Amino acid sequence: MKTLVLLSALILLAFQVQADPIQNTDEETKTEEQPGKEDQAVSVSFGDPEGSSLQEESLRDLVCYCRTRGCKRRERMNGTCRKGHLIYTLCCR
């Protein structure tokens, strides 16, 4: 199960890297200076739509956040997120 979560986090990271265009340095500094923009929600679903053993209630919706300061109380670090040239911590619960 941990392998599946890690693999899903890496796939999400790959999609995010491909989706985000490379930003100029000026735009990155503006992003860094804006408070409250540090957390981004990501929803992960496991299994196929027909149903499988992986679609248990606890694994159906894994909510992940890209955080700058580390994970919160009930979250675990599952990798990293990248937006432009900035690297964040991927925290899931």
Curated annotation (Swiss-Prot):
Subcellular location: Secreted
Name by which UniProt lists this protein: Alpha-defensin 23
Biological role stated in the UniProt entry: May have microbicidal activities.
Keyword Ribonucleoprotein: no
Primary location: secreted
Residues of the propeptide: 20-58
Record's GO cellular component terms: extracellular space
GO terms for biological process, alphabetical: defense response to bacterium
Signal peptide (residue range): 1-19
Organism: Mus musculus
tRNA-binding listed as a keyword: no
